[in-house]
Amino acid sequence: MARVCQVTGKAPMVGNNVSHANNKTKRRFLPNLQNRRFWSESENRWIRLRVSNAALRTIDKKGIDVVVSELRARGEKV
């Protein structure tokens, strides 16, 4: 399973660890992904999504039914 948010599309980024001596080594910044299930009133069922913490805030703001309809419009299976 890819480390990608289903709602926002956030994926790992590449950057550097920087020491006090300014030595740089490559590292990955991973999105804060959570496996969550949301209750959809309109569909009367639970919907499982792998979402980032930022996407949880988006779902709180817009509502799960709006977010799921946007996912389906993009062609994702939910």
Curated annotation (Swiss-Prot):
Picking any one GO molecular function of the record gives: structural constituent of ribosome
Which GO BP terms sit in this record?
translation
Q: Which Pfam families match?
A: Ribosomal_L28
Cellular component (GO) terms are: cytosolic large ribosomal subunit
Q: Please indicate if the UniProt record lists Oxidoreductase as a keyword.
A: no
Q: Does the keyword Ribonucleoprotein apply?
A: yes
Keywords annotated in UniProt = Ribonucleoprotein, Ribosomal protein
| NCBIfam families the record matches | L28
Instruction: Write out the similarity annotation.
Output: Belongs to the bacterial ribosomal protein bL28 family.
* Name of the protein: Large ribosomal subunit protein bL28
Q: What is the species of this protein?
A: Aromatoleum aromaticum (strain DSM 19018 / LMG 30748 / EbN1)
**Gene encoding it?**
rpmB
